[in-house]
């Protein structure tokens, strides 16, 4: 893991097309601005983990499958 120190208003670059700028610092809270191409997915780690957990739970409960299949038939 690379650890960098940055001050408010300073940035780091990831590759040629992703820029992360420190927008504000208040105590332990840091606000960052991220500029990246639209095709780059940017999500908070805790949100991605929550979605993954919900997907696992949904896959374990097949009782909702018939209703899902009926909804999908509308688009075929």
From Swiss-Prot:
Gene Ontology CC, one term: cytosol
NCBIfam families: csrA, PRK01712.1
Name of the featured protein: Translational regulator CsrA
Function: A translational regulator that binds mRNA to regulate translation initiation and/or mRNA stability. Usually binds in the 5'-UTR at or near the Shine-Dalgarno sequence preventing ribosome-binding, thus repressing translation. Its main target seems to be the major flagellin gene, while its function is anatagonized by FliW.
Alphabetized GO MF terms: mRNA 5'-UTR binding
Compartment annotation: Cytoplasm
Keywords: Bacterial flagellum biogenesis, Cytoplasm, Repressor, RNA-binding, Translation regulation
Family indicated by similarity: Belongs to the CsrA/RsmA family.
InterPro entries given in the database record: CsrA, CsrA_sf
Pfam families hit by this protein: CsrA
GO BP of this protein: bacterial-type flagellum organization; mRNA catabolic process; negative regulation of translational initiation; regulation of bacterial-type flagellum assembly; regulation of carbohydrate metabolic process
Cytoplasm keyword on record: yes
Source organism, top-level taxon: Bacteria
Membrane-traversing stretches: none
Oligomeric and partner information: Homodimer; the beta-strands of each monomer intercalate to form a hydrophobic core, while the alpha-helices form wings that extend away from the core.
């Amino acid at each position: 893991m690379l650890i960098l120190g940055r001050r408010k208003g300073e940035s780091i670059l990831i590759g040629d097309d992703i820029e992360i700028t420190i927008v504000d610092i208040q105590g332990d809270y840091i606000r960052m601005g991220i500029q990246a191409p639209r095709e780059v997915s940017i999500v908070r780690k805790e949100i991605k983990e929550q979605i993954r957990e919900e997907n696992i739970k949904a896959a374990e409960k097949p009782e909702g499958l018939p209703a899902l299949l009926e909804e999908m038939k509308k688009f075929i």
